[in-house]
Amino acid sequence: MPRSRINGNFIDKTSSIVANILLQIIPTTSGEKRAFTYYRDGMLAQSEGNYAEALQNYYEATRLEIDPYDRSYILYNIGLIHTSNGEHTKALEYYFRALERNPFLPQAFNNMAVICHYRGEQAILQGDSEIAEAWFDQAAEYWKQAIALTPGNYIEAQNWLKITKRFEFE
């Protein structure tokens, strides 16, 4: 069983207390409760920069969690850690898996776009403009999906799409 920790921050303490109360009163299976505990501990470890511990908790949470919607957020957070670690291929895999379970995660589309844009920039530095354009086109598609889900967000992406003539906004 993962260790439960309460941070010294008042808001974190309050959130932990509320989460513990909800775990006790909401009618869920013991497996779902354990999955949530691992997820919560994973988020705490991730927020502290302890990515190895966070991944262990998230992997255990995915093993226990049966709800596709809840699993999508666990998988998304695993993707975030792989992105932070520079493991972009793994990150993309987890973002895809999250979107398979919950296609309404604009942040996953955005992060996938950022990775593709970065890879496009790397291709330019290596002198391969054809590969760069393919990556930029893929980034544009992901940003369009993120923007479609949350039209008021991702202003920088919208500006990039306009400047590069990859998308016209009304």
Curated annotation (Swiss-Prot):
Q: Which Pfam families match?
A: TPR_1
Record InterPro entries: PSI_Ycf3_assembly, TPR-like_helical_dom_sf, TPR_rpt, Ycf3/AcsC/BcsC/TPR_MFPF
Q: Which residues cross the membrane?
A: none
Gene3D superfamilies reported for this sequence:
Tetratricopeptide repeat domain
Q: Which GO terms describe its biological process?
A: photosynthesis
Q: Does the keyword Plastid apply?
A: yes
Question: What Gene Ontology terms describe where this protein resides (cellular component)?
Answer: chloroplast thylakoid membrane
Q: Sorted alphabetically, which HAMAP family does this protein's record hold?
A: Ycf3
Q: Which NCBIfam families match?
A: PRK02603.1
Protein name listed in UniProt: Photosystem I assembly protein Ycf3
Organism, scientific name: Saccharum officinarum
